[in-house]
């Protein structure tokens, strides 16, 4: 667990060292930190970042093959975003699909921007924390976010019309910003307190 000088993380670190289960509290803290993340002058290659994140998520969860499909751009997509915000947004979308659904993530260039599209079939619809994260990412990058979802109850919730969510983000490229190296999938996979393990808690192996 990254502690730094945050008293909340120091407290959770002490609780974890004493054997307490801090995953639920750490999840709430990670989401709060992501939503409060300030603008950054450094860029993430969203194509590489998302590919690594989805690779780690696919290996971390107990799910059938094919529940997640990712199509990343072969070209870099540098966007000035805090890493913790992007990771939280992507993982919350993936979590929607984990109980019994499937997810599709695509990233492509488009007229000076990165275009990220998320689609998921979800028995529970879109969780309350997902849309604010996506909108915050769009706002920090100076972009746009469009999202929709079918109702959880009623006609669209039957077997022929399973509930779904969809979101599209258009995020301007930051081609002159310093580019951060993407994380390593193994670090996200094997660190018990990584965003993958914490934000997908309850579904990981």
Where would I find each of the regions flagged by the language model?
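Short beta-strand/loop element within the Bergerat-fold HATPase_c
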Residues: 102-114, 118
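Conserved catalytic submotifs in the C-terminal HATPase_c
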Residues: 69-77
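Conserved ATP-binding N-box helix of the HATPase_c
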Residues: 56, 82-105, 131-140
């Amino acid at each position: 667990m990254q502690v730094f000088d945050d008293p909340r993380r120091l407290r959770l670190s002490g609780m974890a060292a004493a054997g307490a289960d801090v995953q639920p509290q750490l999840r709430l803290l990670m989401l709060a930190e992501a939503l409060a993340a300030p603008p950054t002058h450094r860029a993430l290659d969203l194509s590489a970042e998302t590919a690594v994140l989805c690779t780690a998520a696919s290996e971390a969860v107990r799910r059938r093959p094919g529940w997640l499909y990712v199509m990343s751009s072969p070209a870099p997509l540098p966007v000035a975003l805090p890493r913790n915000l992007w990771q939280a947004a992507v993982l919350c979308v993936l979590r929607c699909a984990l109980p019994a659904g499937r997810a599709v993530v695509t990233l492509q260039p488009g007229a000076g921007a990165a275009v990220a599209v998320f689609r998921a079939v979800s028995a529970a619809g879109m969780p309350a924390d997902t849309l604010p994260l996506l909108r915050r990412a769009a706002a920090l990058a100076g972009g746009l976010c469009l999202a929709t979802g079918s109702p959880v109850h009623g006609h669209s919730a039957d077997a022929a019309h399973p509930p779904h969510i969809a979101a599209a983000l258009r995020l301007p490229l930051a081609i002159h910003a310093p580019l951060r190296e993407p994380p390593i999938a193994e670090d996200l996979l094997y660190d018990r307190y990584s965003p993958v393990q914490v934000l997908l808690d309850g579904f990981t192996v």
